[in-house]
């Protein structure tokens, strides 16, 4: 059964205001973070989110911070309109889709030296000169598993998840097995 069209929010302040509006109505907010190109596994997380909250927010954001400069970010699949259409058929629907352009963009005031010193790992974000300087590190994960071959992956994921939590301010978050 098709649901109503979700509200699309691209501005982080508007997203935060939406969440606070829901909270003022005593609604619990569940959040599912995605990079888009939604498949049945991700859609099932949204169905699960409905079991734990009154409203569901989904982010669709390709995180530059988890890609190394030598990875081809342009080949990452993207179909925003298709994703929104798929969300219409999730039982219970989705109230809001947060689709920011760039959560690392600091405008003119950000630094533009294009990287970090001392031979540290560099992601697409630093290489682009956006001036992002604060990162959330998960050192144990960075040293093992795929952390050795994907030097910025866990740092980028942990950082963006922290940013999204601070913007969306969810009561409940639903992750899948591949998110750990």
Predicted features along the sequence, with ranges:
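Nucleotidyltransferase catalytic core that binds NTPs
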Residues: 1-180
């Amino acid at each position: 059964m098709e649901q109503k069209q979700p509200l699309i929010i691209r501005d982080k302040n508007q997203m935060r205001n939406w969440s606070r509006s829901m909270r003022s109505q005593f609604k619990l907010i569940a959040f599912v973070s995605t990079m888009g190109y939604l498949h049945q596994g991700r859609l099932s997380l949204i169905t699960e989110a409905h079991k734990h909250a009154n409203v569901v927010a989904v982010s669709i954001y390709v995180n530059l911070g988890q890609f190394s400069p030598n990875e081809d970010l342009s080949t990452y699949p993207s179909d925003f309109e298709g994703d929104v259409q798929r969300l219409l058929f999730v039982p219970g629907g989705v109230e809001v889709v947060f689709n920011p352009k760039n959560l690392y963009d600091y405008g003119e005031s950000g630094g533009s030296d294009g990287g970090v010193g001392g031979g540290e790992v560099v992601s697409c974000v630093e290489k682009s000169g956006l001036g992002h300087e604060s990162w959330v590190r998960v050192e144990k994960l960075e040293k093992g598993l795929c952390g050795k071959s994907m030097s910025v992956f866990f740092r980028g994921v942990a950082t963006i998840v922290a940013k999204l939590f601070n913007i969306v301010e969810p009561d409940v978050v639903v992750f899948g097995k591949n998110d750990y």
